[in-house]
Amino acid sequence: MFSSESVTEGHPDKICDQISDAIVDALLTADPLSRVAAEVVVNTGMVILTGEITSQAHVNFTRLVRDKVAEIGYTDAKNGFSAESCAVLVAFDEQSPDIAQGVNLALESRTSQEDEFDLIGAGDQGLMFGFACDETPELMPLPISLAHRLSRQLAAVRKNGTLPYLRPDGKTQVTVAYEEGRPVGIHTLLISTQHTPTIGAITEEAAVQERIRADLWEAVVQPVFAELPIKPDGNTRFLTNPTGKFVIGGPQGDAGLTGRKIIVDTYGGYSRHGGGAFSGKDPTKVDRSAAYAARYVAKNIVAAGLAQKCEVQVSYAIGVARPINLLVETFGTGRIPDEALLRLVQRHFDLRPAAILAQFQLRELPRQRGGRFYQNVAVYGHFGQTHLDLPWERTDKAALLREEAFAGATAILG
């Protein structure tokens, strides 16, 4: 069995991620060359913005915060956190010139530049992972895919009034049963959702929880699984608000920080993680852009039918354009050797930061999408949301990889 969790947009850490990425969107929309490292802290009645920004853009950060908090659903001060009454403290510095010089002019541009993609160095050292598998149509692990579906539906029934007693904070967790490496059933579903103390005339705590449990099954679980081949059954354990109630939530219940939900943001623990968060960072930061590129590589390999599972690791040195290492691992599911896949990747994917920026248009996307792009992926996962038309989710190289792998496997092996 394997478990993964997701959270709704009203979770304190996710509030921070969305504000951080709304800042990235606003700055890149006005100045695509902005350098951003925006960190956010939320607590009862307070939002703190800090980090480093170098940009020609002028942004009203206080208004941006209030608009995003209201959009998420915190509009009532009685809940301990409200868009219009919370304090907003802003404390940004500029990016360190020592870091900037390595990003602006990579080591290669000062020693052995071959083309324009050697100009930009990695914004930091680090290692990033990308992953894909064939458990779902979007080529994501099934546990995290289901957890995100439940969280998204939980937020939807709150916002559309189906369950008006719900409040913005919520979490989901799904445990999937596997046999011989393939998902075969749903072992446990867990939904914790913030709610009002009473529901209409229902005031007794146990009765409130009974109503919530029944409503969540009908309005959240059943719609999510309606058209899926694997469904909960009589053996599935269904848990809702196991503490007995969840009235106090959001920033009033827990402080939130940017970058504390990196497993929710990626593969639900199914794949390894390099440790770097995504939100609040402009795409010169390889924590973000290289993780997107690694997902793109892995997804195209699986989409090509060259493996059932694929994990890609890439690492960088600060101020250096070319990756330090590249690793392809298919866990015994590859149709050609991993060494052959590595050679294919080296031939067809350019993982220098400037090349990633150019291919995915990561600096231009906020402006192209009307001022909001990164904030949309700051909740419900940076991977697998195919409805958002994310460039790293495309499988436009799958046919090429398939053709070359099977036509020239011997040549690739050398």
Curated annotation (Swiss-Prot):
ATP binds at H11, D169, G170, K171, K245, F246, D254, R260, K261, A277, K281. The keyword Transferase applies. Catalyzes the formation of S-adenosylmethionine (AdoMet) from methionine and ATP. The overall synthetic reaction is composed of two sequential steps, AdoMet formation and the subsequent tripolyphosphate hydrolysis which occurs prior to release of AdoMet from the enzyme. Transmembrane segments: none annotated. It catalyses: L-methionine + ATP + H2O = S-adenosyl-L-methionine + phosphate + diphosphate. Its EC number is 2.5.1.6. It is found in: Cytoplasm. Homotetramer; dimer of dimers. Its main location: cytoplasm. Binds 2 divalent ions per subunit. K(+) binds at E39. L-methionine binds at E52, Q95, D254, K285. GO terms for cellular component: cytoplasm. One of its GO terms (biological process) is one-carbon metabolic process. It comes from Synechococcus sp. (strain JA-3-3Ab) (Cyanobacteria bacterium Yellowstone A-Prime). This is S-adenosylmethionine synthase. Keywords: ATP-binding, Cytoplasm, Magnesium, Metal-binding, Nucleotide-binding, One-carbon metabolism, Potassium, Transferase. Residues 95-105 are annotated as: Flexible loop. Belongs to the AdoMet synthase family. Its cofactor is Mg(2+); K(+). NCBIfam families: metK. Pfam families: S-AdoMet_synt_C (PF02773), S-AdoMet_synt_M (PF02772), S-AdoMet_synt_N (PF00438).
